Amino acid sequence: MNKITTSSAAAQLERMYDDLNKAFFEGKLPDAIITLKCTKGAYGHFTTGQIWRVDESTHKHEINISSATLDRPALQTAATLLHEMVHFYCHINNIRDTSNHGVYHNHKYKEAALDHGLLVFYVKYYGWTNTQPSDALRLLAVENAWPQIKLAEDTRSYTAGPSSTRKYLCPQCGLTCRATKKVNLICGDCKLP
């Protein structure tokens, strides 16, 4: 069996990105940097800023696929990638597809997703976030042999331990502060310890 590496997983995702771009965006989406990082509470995310510097004059957007979710079937990973590509499409076309700091996916996101080969379903408080592959996406996956792509051999679920963050409250003005260990603080507003 071939050894699974971060670079091989990223290369497979880049191939998916190219296939999806050609099939659902007529190849018009700019290249993006595909990253693999653990994203708590999400399968992936799109970064609206061009945070990756390629050279002096070229910067690129980032699409992250959560490394903790790479054990899912390739079709589900492709649906997540397409979900983030729809955000990219909306961003470069000045379509405001989310609110509540990018959490709530509105009807404009739904329309863009449906127009670009993705099925989305409503989830209370989050909007049109439940992503499922359409028949067109399933067909593209078969045509491009995505079912044979295995992005992760074995990922283990883990339960996070108790948080080490503490919340401190000024007894006079109510100002709050968080710290990861016991600290001696003085309130900057009312100067009380």
Tell where the protein language model's regions lie, with residue ranges.
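An amphipathic alpha-helix signature
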Residues: 78-79, 110
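Conserved glycine-rich acetyl-CoA-binding loop
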Residues: 75
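Active-site recognition of the HExxH zinc-binding catalytic motif
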Residues: 79-92
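Metalloprotease/metallohydrolase-associated module, dominated by Zn2+-dependent proteases
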Residues: 2-72, 95-193
